[in-house]
Amino acid sequence: MSAAEGPLVVGVDTSTQSTKALVVDVATGEVVASGQAPHTVSSGAGRESDPRQWWDALREALHQCGDAAREAAAVSVAGQQHGLVTLDAQGAPVRPALLWNDVRSAPQARRLVEELGGPKAWAERTGSVPGPSITVTKWAWLAEHEPESVRATTAVRLPHDYLTELLTGQGTTDRGDASGTGWWASGTEAYDEEVLGHVGLDPTLLPRVVRPGEVVGTVRDSAGLPFAKGTLVAPGTGDNAAAALGLGLRPGTAVLSLGTSGTVYAVSTRRPADPTGTVAGFADARGDWLPLACTLNCTLAVDRVAALLGIDREAVEPGASVTLLPYLDGERTPALPHASGLLHGLRHDTTAGQLLQAAYDGAVHSLLGALDLVLDEDADRSAPLLLIGGGARGRAWQQTVRRLSGRAVQVPEAKELVALGAAAQAAGVLTGEDPAAVARRWNTARGPVLEVGERDEAALARIAGVISDAAPLLEREADQR
Ligand SMILES: Nc1ncnc2c1ncn2[C@@H]1O[C@H](COP(=O)(O)OP(=O)(O)O)[C@@H](O)[C@H]1O
Ligand SMILES: O=C(CO)[C@@H](O)[C@H](O)COP(=O)(O)O
């Protein structure tokens, strides 16, 4: 037996690059065991992963947790948002999942926006103007390009739903993750039958949307995982909504998450509806809202630039007037799905370290542009930004965010806030507590604060100028290059 004070729970984060599992003491928030196993994502035109890998990675991550996982009384799975998982009558994937950062459905997104009333109508209806990340556009792409896959599909799931169903045998999802599909109406909090009819998706193929705090089932014996009989399963949610739980986030505090995706978000009590499409009007996992902007190019893109230059990711140098837009995967914020990376202002005396700093600046610029938009008007804009995700460990990321935001930056010591949020949700179904209150009790946001500095307006203006001047290049579709 572990020396934990309270019951134990397991929180899972199945994100783009890996699945992580934490075993957490409900009384103290102490992480008593952890595990992590990688996934692979296809390269080339699309971004796909075989969902069976996520299950194998979950088993491996739990195996690494050892006996502590066997003692867990509840588990919850948080996962990368938006991925389209199509299952056949046996529950097996019909094809690999189309991930959030697959931009092939950009034409379908454009068409759907036009056909169903334009950007404002979509924002009011679903909270978001669908771009290629949003699941409904992926379903429309599949219907057009692989009608045989659509015909073979008897269930449609998101990544966290897929794993939760393998645990419980029940097809369920939650409002946080459902709000990223484009077929969930944020006004009524129900599936939008008109949108579904428009794309030919039968609503009976979708999972039941459970209430926050509902126990969705218990772990099946047949799951073959190291859980005791009767282990409760919590609803789970999308990874950003889980991190908001994991931070015990209150309205008015902004979060910047630096992982495969870059995201900026805040909790709001007001239902968002941004007709420009910059802010996605997601629901959170508790009953509030999570206005969020997301970039496709964050840590992987900057690490790629460092690798190309042959230098360490921390080997940045200041003082350049070079601009690097690191849109290696196309971009979502700004909405440039067909863009590629762009370099401007290179001189004989530009150093490799300056080029790398320019890549950090380009990545952070996109996120900061949306910062004010995700915060309510009455938010305290002098409060520190919370910096999380794998990139938050890096000094170059921390200093870039501090310099370009002109805000104080707080870096929580807790490393895995998505998995911690899932653990807080699992604790909530066990004790009846609000998961965000659990996380506050665990003091998960604790960490050093980098003091406020002067905002680098010159760099911000230079980057904005290049984006604007290069618009025709950045907007050009791949086959026009
Ligand atoms: N010390 C560090 N400094 C900078 N970046 C880091 C550091 N540690 C990890 N990373 C970056 O974090 C990323 C993984 O972050 P994570 O939030 O786990 O991603 P995801 O949840 O999207 O799978 C990797 O791409 C890696 O480049
Ligand atoms: O698409 C979004 C948010 O809308 C992404 O944030 C995904 O949820 C993937 O997250 P990570 O794997 O980068 O954590």
Model-derived segments and their meaning:
Residues 63, 67-100, 126-133, 160, ...:
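Short beta-strand-loop/turn "lid" adjacent to the catalytic site in phosphate-handling enzymes
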